C-alpha cells in the first residue's frame, strides 16, 4: 500500500497526557534521543519545511506534539531522551509523561525509533527498544542523518545498530537532506496503520 501525504497540520501541543486527543484516530509515535532528527523526519515525509520546528539545540521538543495527517491519523512527536540541558526534575517529568503515553495509549499503532546512523546506540536507545518490545508495541528502527556518511560507512554503521539492538532486520536508512529512505518509510508507516 502506498501512503500519500496530502495534508499535514499541527493539531496540538500537550504537556500532560490527560489532555491528549480523545477518540480512536490511529497514532504513530516518534521516539529517539534529543537532536536525532525527529522534526526533520516529520517535515520531510510531509513535504513541509517548517511543520515541525527543528533546532540544532538538543531538547527543543519538551512536549508531546500531535500532527494530523490526511485527517486520518496522528504522527506524535515525543520529547527526546538523552542529553537535553534541563533540570533533573524536568527530565523526570518528561520520562514519566513518555512512559505513561507509551504504556497507556490505546490509539498507538507503532513507534518509529530514530537513531543517528553515525553513533552506536546508547543505553537509552537500548532501554527504549527493550521496553517497547516488553509492551508489545510494533517498532520500526530508522537510522537518520544517512547523508553524513558514505554508502560504505552506512552499511557498517547500520550493521552495528542492528547487532547492538539485536534487531531481526536492518534498520531503515533515512536522510531528511537527500530524501533517502522517504518512500520506504512511507511504505512502513502504511503497514503500521
Swiss-Prot record:
Q: Which PROSITE patterns is this protein grouped with?
A: G_ENGB
What Gene Ontology molecular-function terms does this entry list?
A: GTP binding; metal ion binding
**Residues that, per the record, bind Mg(2+):** 39, 61
Positions binding GTP in this chain are 32-39, 59-63, 77-80, 144-147, 174-176
Give the EngB-type G domain ranges: 24-193
Cysteines engaged in disulfide bonds, as pairs: none
InterPro entries listed in its UniProt record? G_ENGB_dom, GTP-bd, GTP-bd_ribosome_bio_YsxC, P-loop_NTPase
Does the keyword GTP-binding belong to this entry?
yes
The protein's required cofactor(s) are namely:
Mg(2+)
Q: Which NCBIfam families does the UniProt entry name for this protein?
A: GTPase_YsxC
Q: Which family does it belong to?
A: Belongs to the TRAFAC class TrmE-Era-EngA-EngB-Septin-like GTPase superfamily. EngB GTPase family.
- Give the protein's recorded name: Probable GTP-binding protein EngB
Amino acid at each position: 500500500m502506498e501512503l500519500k501525504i496530502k495534508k499535514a497540520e499541527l493539531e496540538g501541543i500537550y504537556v500532560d497526557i490527560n489532555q491528549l486527543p480523545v477518540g480512536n484516530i490511529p497514532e504513530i509515535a516518534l521516539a529517539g534521543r534529543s537532536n536525532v532528527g525527529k522534526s526533520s523526519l516529520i517535515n520531510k515525509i510531509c513535504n513541509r519545511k517548517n511543520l515541525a520546528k527543528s533546532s540544532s539545540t538538543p531538547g527543543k521538543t519538551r512536549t508531546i506534539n500531535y500532527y494530523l495527517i490526511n485527517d486520518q491519523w496522528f504522527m506524535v512527536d515525543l520529547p527526546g531522551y538523552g542529553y537535553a540541558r534541563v533540570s533533573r526534575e524536568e527530565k523526570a517529568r518528561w520520562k514519566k509523561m513518555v512512559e505513561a503515553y507509551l504504556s497507556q495509549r490505546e490509539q498507538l499503532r507503532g513507534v518509529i525509533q530514530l537513531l543517528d546512523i553515525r553513533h552506536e546506540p546508547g543505553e537509552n536507545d537500548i532501554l527504549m527498544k527493550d521496553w517497547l518490545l516488553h509492551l508489545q508495541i510494533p517498532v520500526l528502527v530508522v537510522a537518520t542523518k544517512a547523508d553524513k556518511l558514505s554508502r560504505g560507512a552506512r552499511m557498517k554503521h547500520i550493521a552495528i545498530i542492528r547487532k547492538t539492538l539485536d534487531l531481526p532486520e536492518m534498520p531503515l536508512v533515512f536522510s531528511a537532506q537527500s530524501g533517502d529512505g522517504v518512500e520506504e518509510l512511507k511504505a512502513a508507516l502504511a503497514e503500521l496503520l
